[in-house]
Amino acid sequence: MDQISYFNKTVASKDMSGYYLLKNGEYAYNKSYSVGYDFGSVKRLDRYDMGALSTLYICFALKKHDSDFIKAYFDSLKWYREIYMISAEGARNHGLLNVPTDEFFDTKHYIPQDLAEQRKIANFMIALERRIVAQQSLVDNLKKYKRGLSKAVFS
């Protein structure tokens, strides 16, 4: 994320030692749970060429799979079953799951090995996401229209 537009200032230190450099298309696992993400989340860096992440994240790149398919897979939360088996939460972790890096990379994921099949699934998920975004935009515009109409009618 762009710090200036989000925080209205630069909040990062000039000393970047102790951080991971994530490149566009690479993934990071955030071990913190939040609403809707009981076992954390895996996200792909898409908006920027590079980003710096704390060593609290588990960062990785994939070479043998379709990246859009893997993004959809991690968005599905299907992988939670494996994380559940290896995670523990300590009393002082403030919502940070104890997921050892080596065990994270040893988890089993049952995904199609055929790249063409992965690509078909990814294309379907991308088309569906675009449809959702378009429908949400339509809903947002209708809500604005309703507010304007209500204001005109009831004032």
Regions found by a protein language model. Name each.
Residues 76, 101-104, 147:
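ATP/adenylate-binding site constellation spanning eukaryotic-like Ser/Thr protein kinases
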Residues 111-155:
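Amphipathic alpha-helical coiled-coil/heptad-repeat segments
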